[in-house]
Structure formats: structure tokens, C-alpha cells
Amino acid sequence: LEPLFETDKKYYTKEEFESEPMLVIHLAKNEIYARHGYIFTNEDLYNYFMGCIWYSPTCDAADFDDSIFNEYEKANLEILADLDTY
């Protein structure tokens, strides 16, 4: 599966995300973590991202440091986290 959004390469607006189904918003938020090798403890998220050829689970939650996110990811994650009620 290809990434849902290029959240690491461009700034999105709240309006761009609001038209998406809640599941897509939830996955897009977690895709930012997955891009950096976050190992999901949630089985559904883990299985979804394992189906993505680009996903390489390398870092568990205890060792994950969100300072790895670039400025695009930080801004987009803030919007997605506010919208994610899944």
C-alpha cells in the first residue's frame, strides 16, 4: 500500500483532512509514526502497516522519540491528532 498522504513533504490544512473518513484520518496520523519505524502494539494498526511495503518496524514505543519528526510531520500530526476520534 502506498502512503495515504505526503505528510512528511507538505503542509496540509484542517479542511483538507476534514473531508476524509475517520478511519483515513486515524491511519494518516499513525502513518507519520510508521514512517519512522514505530512498532504498533495495536494489532489492527500493526497488521495494516505490515501490509505496506515501505514499513519497517524498528522502534518500540518505549524507545520512540518524536523529535525525529520534521516540521511538516509535526504540523500535520497536530491537525490529525485533533481530528482523530477513531
Language model segments and positions:
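N-terminal low-complexity, Pro/Thr/Ser-rich intrinsically disordered segments
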Residues: 1-12
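Amphipathic alpha-helical packing elements
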Residues: 16-20, 24-57
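Compact alpha-helical subdomains of small soluble proteins
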Residues: 40-86
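Conserved aromatic-histidine-acidic binding/catalytic patches
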Residues: 13, 17-20, 65-68
